């Protein structure tokens, strides 16, 4: 793989994760800027490496990344006496790892569609919360 392609993939993931992480940081969310960038860029780098190595078990490696990120997301859950908060944050961490993997594999169209769906979901969720719906 050409160096320019690797840089493009990593920078695209960095830039889009930066935007999302900045928005979360600005809104004082418990998990913000750094986490989303590091998770997605790390996943992207591992996907690039796996595809470069042509491993027979690269799918298993990528699956292990997604599973491992699930544990990181679980750390974002906050329990009070009668409620649990942070499911959207946990799911966001998980989907950003998948976003990074997909871009790392060179699936730009699919990655950008996922990124768009993430924003639509988060903005819709905020709208519903702000209007006490649900």
State where each predicted segment sits.
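Short, Lys/Arg-enriched charge-dense amphipathic segments
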Residues: 53, 75-82, 102, 132-134
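Hydrophobic transmembrane alpha-helices of secondary-active transporters
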Residues: 15-20, 70-78, 100
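Membrane-embedded alpha-helical core segments of multi-pass
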Residues: 70, 95, 117-125
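Small-residue-rich segments of transmembrane alpha-helices in multi-pass membrane proteins
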Residues: 37-48, 68-72, 91-105
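Alpha-helical transmembrane-segment detector that highlights a single hydrophobic TM helix
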Residues: 56-84, 90-91
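Alpha-helical transmembrane segments and their membrane-interface boundaries
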Residues: 1-61, 105-106, 111-114, 121-134
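A general structural signal for short secondary-structure boundary/capping elements
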Residues: 83-86, 120-122
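Membrane-helix boundary connector in multi-pass membrane proteins
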Residues: 79-85, 96-111
